[in-house]
Amino acid sequence: MNSSFSAPAKKSLGQHFLADRYYIDRIVQAVDPRAGQHLVEIGPGQGAITFPLLRKHGALTVIEFDRDLIAPLTEAAAPIGALRIIHRDVLSVDFTALADGTPIRLVGNLPYNISSPILFHALDHAAAVADMHFMLQKEVVDRMAAGPGSKVYGRLSVMLQAYCEVTALFVVPPGAFRPPPKVDSAVVRLVPRDPATVLINDRRRFADVVRAGFGQRRKTLRNALSAICEPAHFDAAQVRPDARAEQLEVADFIRLANVELA
């Protein structure tokens, strides 16, 4: 039984509503909600994922920015389970406060136009997040999961993999959506690492090193990082200054950012 409803997609909000039952079921199976868990869906839209999750779990919190979807979501959810709706921009939601001591499981078909900001916002609250299952443009998922040497390995890859285990799960074709996007989508799982194993001394310094390294990716690290790293930084971190950012492992960036010169 599908309780999702029809509503026009708003291009300004980057909305593409999932409509294919096969892929809806695959996402719900990947999430595999269990009793006692705190599920939070970002951008429920027409409820394609919302209502199957609610039916399976009994309770769900959703964050929806589009006010026109609030009433139909509330009405359709009433006979199914306890749906809590937060009508706000997801980037303004404090996930740590929302978790309230119980790590949240984030789920969502993320709007293409703000997917990266949402990912970095979730990272800021990683200690309060158990895991994340997101659908995004396939090219973004490819970048998230890429390794050194790949043409799509970059800032997003390093920043996410430093704090999370990233696993690309499956591709979702344009025809599964209404309206269909122009590109393939993919579902990705992110599991935040134990904070005790994330050996980053200064998060801002780490982010600065990664950003600068990939900001001019054709340059050697010596040149790309000249404003923030001295030759001694490379020596102490055992990182070759004549290498390029795309050749470094995540651990190399962490060591380089952690170096403190006397």
Curated annotation (Swiss-Prot):
E.C. designation(s): 2.1.1.182
Binding site for S-adenosyl-L-methionine: H16, L18, G43, E64, D89, N109
GO cellular component terms attached to this protein's record: cytosol
Keywords recorded for this protein, A-Z: Cytoplasm, Methyltransferase, RNA-binding, rRNA processing, S-adenosyl-L-methionine, Transferase
Protein localization: Cytoplasm
Principal location listed in the UniProt entry: cytoplasm
GO molecular function: 16S rRNA (adenine(1518)-N(6)/adenine(1519)-N(6))-dimethyltransferase activity; RNA binding
A family per Pfam: RrnaAD
Broad class of enzyme this protein falls into: transferase
Family according to the record: Belongs to the class I-like SAM-binding methyltransferase superfamily. rRNA adenine N(6)-methyltransferase family. RsmA subfamily.
Known function: Specifically dimethylates two adjacent adenosines (A1518 and A1519) in the loop of a conserved hairpin near the 3'-end of 16S rRNA in the 30S particle. May play a critical role in biogenesis of 30S subunits.
Family matches, as PANTHER family: DIMETHYLADENOSINE TRANSFERASE, DIMETHYLADENOSINE TRANSFERASE-RELATED
NCBIfam families reported for this sequence: ksgA (TIGR00755)
Name of the protein in question: Ribosomal RNA small subunit methyltransferase A
Organism: Xanthomonas axonopodis pv. citri (strain 306)
Upper lineage: Bacteria, Pseudomonadati, Pseudomonadota, Gammaproteobacteria, Lysobacterales
